Design a protein with these regions (language model features):
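Active-site donor/metal-binding and catalytic loop motifs
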Residues: 207-223, 237
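A short, conserved alpha-helix in the catalytic core of glycosyltransferases
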Residues: 160-168, 172-177, 183-210
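Glycine-rich, basic loop-to-helix element that forms the pyrophosphate-binding segment
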Residues: 59-76
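Conserved donor NDP-sugar-binding/catalytic core segment of glycosyltransferases
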Residues: 93-132
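Short, acidic, metal-binding catalytic loop of nucleotide-sugar glycosyltransferases
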Residues: 21-30
Length: 291
């Protein structure tokens, strides 16, 4: 069974280079990498790889994440699909473990992600990534479970799909109807996708040994730069599923007096929008690994 790795890119060249290097160093390399570009032109001078790299351009000034994922799937040649965020660096067994899990049984498989501090990524003298350093510095998110390297564990909650690293078969993506492209900008489209997969009776599992390291980028708490998209996408999700997603961020906005909302409410009322100083003040220090 052949396997396509898929990633989405907007202005993350160095992170993409590191992802590509890590995929080329896999115990079992992907049979291709599909890059969905959410920018006017693809990056140039990318590293050579021992697998084909295919490109698809995705239009949209706002971050068209759902459209880009669907475009990547449509471009992929193979039935087994591994989605990796461009901020990820794959550990050497990631593709091998996802491939093993999908051969064993179709479903949605989630891999562990450990978060790196700023300036964690280093190259060795031979130009390869210093994986020992990444393993030493990577930190597990407190909301995520630890998985043994050879373990496959059922996951009953579809809400635990975070879009950084997961795998499934093309047929299950099709059964779920793909991603809803009415979600535009940051937030909500992955949770909606998870519930669509669950409604299609696709089983969810954690798979050990499919570890990725998340490369650091600027973080905000509350995530004011994505305020408008989060509100619009949360409303869309609630209309479809009659409950809220992104509750953690909505609570932050509510506590800051920007929205009138509660988990039991059936609507969000925007009271004010963040100002430039408020956005700047919410930027977390470089030591923060997640918001």
């Amino acid at each position: 069974m052949k396997l396509s790795a898929l990633t989405l890119v907007r202005h993350r060249r160095e992170h993409l280079v590191n992802l590509m290097l890590s995929l080329d160093a896999q115990h079992r390399r992907p049979d291709e990498l599909v890059i969905a570009w959410m920018q006017p032109e693809p990056e140039t001078n990318l590293p050579a790889t021992r697998f084909p790299v295919r490109h698809v351009m995705v239009e949209g000034d706002a971050l068209p994440l759902a459209r880009a994922r669907n475009a990547a799937v449509a471009t992929a040649r193979f039935e087994a699909l591994v989605f990796l965020d461009v901020d990820c660096i794959a550990s050497p067994t990631l593709v091998e473990r996802y491939h093993h899990a999908l051969r064993r049984r179709a479903g949605l498989y989630l891999g562990e992600v450990h978060y790196l501090p700023a300036d964690a990524v280093r190259r060795r003298a031979d130009g390869m990534l210093d994986r020992e350093r990444l393993a030493r510095l990577g930190e597990q998110h407190p909301a995520r479970p630890a998985i043994e390297a050879d373990e496959i564990r059922p996951e009953p909650d579809p809400g635990n799909l975070w879009g950084l690293s997961f795998a499934l078969m093309r047929e299950d993506h099709r059964r779920a109807g793909g991603m809803d492209e009415e979600y535009v900008g940051y937030g909500g489209e992955e949770t909606d996708y998870a519930w669509r997969l669950a409604a299609a009776e696709v089983p969810f599992h954690w798979v050990g040994g499919a570890l990725a390291w998340h490369q650091h980028h600027p973080l905000y708490a509350p995530p004011w730069p994505h305020f408008d998209a989060i509100i619009a996408n949360a409303r869309r999700f609630h209309r479809r599923w009659q409950h809220w997603c992104m509750d953690y961020w909505l609570e932050q906005f509510s506590e800051a007096g920007a929205i009138d909302w509660s988990p039991s409410a059936d609507r969000i009322e925007v009271l004010r929008r963040p100002g430039e100083q408020e956005i700047a003040a919410a930027r977390l220090p470089a030591s923060a690994r997640y918001g």
